[in-house]
Amino acid sequence: MLDIVLYEPEIPQNTGNIIRLCANTGFRLHLIEPLGFTWDDKRLRRSGLDYHEFAEIKRHKTFEAFLESEKPKRLFALTTKGCPAHSQVKFKLGDYLMFGPETRGIPMSILNEMPMEQKIRIPMTANSRSMNLSNSVAVTVYEAWRQLGYKGAVNLPEVK
């Protein structure tokens, strides 16, 4: 499947929603510390409901520790500074999709090391700055999953 990477997430409700999304899609979740909340935060638990046990979650102390542990072949950064739209990328099994913290995004020190074609964006209107983190993850996850034929999904309607 694919992997979602949250770089230093700050808002527990967003992370809880993303945990629930990962449980429902089979995508793995990586959390790069420091987190802006404690792991036992009741807001994290409430927003993720009882889905925490159904999601595969890995925590990493630093971005470098994440890279060393996972060795991603293709790591995409979702950023307002991206060039191709999320729907223009041809996702593959094994891809990693990284999202930055809610108030500041992925640091430029990381973005500057990435190829331009791996810095992707979600289209928005001219006056918009950014989208909510959990919404951005959901939009991108479902586009990637659609491209992969909803691998692992059940009860798919037949299209004629």
Curated annotation (Swiss-Prot):
Gene3D superfamilies the record matches: 3.40.1280.10
A molecular function GO annotation: identical protein binding
Record-listed E.C. numbers: 2.1.1.207
Parts of the chain that traverse the membrane: none
A Pfam family recorded for this sequence: SpoU_methylase
Subcellular location: Cytoplasm
Alphabetized InterPro entries for the sequence: Alpha/beta_knot_MTases, SpoU_MeTrfase, TrmL, tRNA_m1G_MTases_N
GO cellular component terms, A-Z: cytoplasm
Record GO biological process: wobble position cytosine ribose methylation; wobble position uridine ribose methylation
Protein name: tRNA (cytidine(34)-2'-O)-methyltransferase
Keywords (A to Z) from UniProt: Cytoplasm, Methyltransferase, S-adenosyl-L-methionine, Transferase, tRNA processing
Sequence similarity: Belongs to the class IV-like SAM-binding methyltransferase superfamily. RNA methyltransferase TrmH family. TrmL subfamily.
Catalysed conversion reaction: cytidine(34) in tRNA + S-adenosyl-L-methionine = 2'-O-methylcytidine(34) in tRNA + S-adenosyl-L-homocysteine + H(+); 5-carboxymethylaminomethyluridine(34) in tRNA(Leu) + S-adenosyl-L-methionine = 5-carboxymethylaminomethyl-2'-O-methyluridine(34) in tRNA(Leu) + S-adenosyl-L-homocysteine + H(+)
Function: Methylates the ribose at the nucleotide 34 wobble position in the two leucyl isoacceptors tRNA(Leu)(CmAA) and tRNA(Leu)(cmnm5UmAA). Catalyzes the methyl transfer from S-adenosyl-L-methionine to the 2'-OH of the wobble nucleotide.
EC top class, as a word: transferase
Keyword match tRNA processing: yes
SUPFAM superfamilies for this protein: alpha/beta knot
HAMAP family in the record: tRNA_methyltr_TrmL
Subunit note: Homodimer.
Binding site for S-adenosyl-L-methionine: 78, 100, 122, 130
